[in-house]
A protein has these predicted regions:
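Activation of the activation-loop gatekeeper triad in protein kinase-fold domains
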Residues: 1-6
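Active-site activation/catalytic loop segments of kinase-like enzymes and analogous catalytic loops
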Residues: 8-46, 61-84, 92
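Long, low-complexity C-terminal extensions of enzymes
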Residues: 85-109
């Protein structure tokens, strides 16, 4: 259960939210966050393949583009702070999706 969004979600949900929405490219790419996360799951006894973890992470990253758009629609773009937040949030989200080639997931629908 995700108490922030009050919904049942994939384990990679919070990881994707943090990494794709909050981290700048250099920090995002400095470490294999999905592998690190997966190793922690495995160390706690979770049986889950890295490939499945990466696939679900990509799905979550694509999903969070919606969050970025919704949040940006509520910002005051008339001031520099709101404009900078919107540019950062959308920029991080779109860069992440491009790096992950997550738009290709839409071809499978």
């Amino acid at each position: 259960v995700d108490f922030q969004a009050t919904c049942k979600s994939a384990p990679e949900h919070d990881l994707a939210y943090f990494v794709t929405q909050s981290l700048k490219r250099d920090v995002r790419n400095a470490k294999d966050w999905v592998r690190f996360y997966h190793e922690e799951l495995i160390s706690e006894g979770v049986e889950y393949s890295l490939e499945d973890c990466r696939a679900r992470y990509r799905e979550c990253a694509l999903y969070f583009l919606c969050y970025a758009v919704v949040i940006c629609s509520a910002l005051d773009l008339g001031n520099e702070r709101g404009k900078l937040m919107a540019e950062t949030l959308l920029g991080n989200s779109l860069e992440s999706i491009k790096e992950l080639e997550a738009f290709k997931l839409l071809e499978t629908l």
